[in-house]
Amino acid sequence: MSSRVLTPDVVGIDALIHDHQTVLAKAEGGVVAVFANNAPAFYAVTPARLAELLALEEKLARPGSDVALDDQLYQEPQAAPVAVPMGKFAMYPDWQPDTDFIRQAALWGVALREPVTAEELASFIAYWQAEGKVFHHVQWQQKLARSLQIGRASNGGLPKRDVNTVSEPDSQIPPGFRG
C-alpha cells in the first residue's frame, strides 16, 4: 500500500517512545512522521505547531469578508429548452446535443475531456444528413459520442500530420546497433 509522508522528519516508534521530547525538539517545523513496521503510523506534533495549525484552521473557517452577496445574483434564469422532435427523426442542419452531453456520454461509457467542437458537430451532421437514417434524439447523441471517441482516438490524440511535408529521417542510432 502506498502512502504519502507530509514531513521530511521521520522517526521509528521506538525512538519516539524512548525520548519524545528530544525527537520533537529536533523536528523541522514541529512535526515528525512516526513509522511502525516500516509504514507511517501517525504524526507527532509539538504544542506550538499544533496551536499554529488550529489558529490557521480557525482563520480559514471564518469568511474572508463581511460583505454578503445578494442571492438574486446567483439565480440565473433557466435557459429555455431546445425543442427536440418527438420520436425518430432524420438528422437536420440545426440539430444540437443536450447541454449535459458530456455527462450523458460518460454514463454511456464514453469519456470526453472536451466538449464537441463546431467542426466535429458539422462533420457529424453532414455525414448523417446524407445517410438519411432516422433515430431518436438520445440515439443521435450516443452516435455522436461514439463518433467523437473514435475520431479523437484515431491518431492517439495528436493533431493530423500535414501530408505535404517531407519527412526527415532520424539520424540517431538506437542502443545495441552499430552505426
Swiss-Prot record:
Biological process per Gene Ontology, one example term? DNA replication, synthesis of primer
Checking Pfam families in the record gives:
DnaT (PF17948)
Could you tell me which residues belong to the region Disordered? 154-179
Entry keyword annotation includes Coiled coil:
no
> What Gene3D superfamilies does this protein map onto?
1.10.8.1180
InterPro entries given for it? Answer: DnaT, DnaT_DNA_bind
Q: Name one GO cellular component term.
A: primosome complex
Keyword Oxidoreductase, does the record have it? no
Q: Which UniProt keywords apply?
A: DNA replication, DNA-binding, Primosome
Q: What family is it from? A: Belongs to the DnaT family.
How it assembles, according to the record, is: Homooligomerizes. Interacts with PriB. Component of the replication restart primosome. Primosome assembly occurs via a 'hand-off' mechanism. PriA binds to replication forks, subsequently PriB then DnaT bind; DnaT then displaces ssDNA to generate the helicase loading substrate.
Q: What does this protein do?
A: Involved in the restart of stalled replication forks, which reloads the replicative helicase on sites other than the origin of replication. Can function in multiple replication restart pathways. Displaces ssDNA from a PriB-ssDNA complex. Probably forms a spiral filament on ssDNA.
> What protein does this entry describe?
Replication restart protein DnaT
Gene coding for it: dnaT
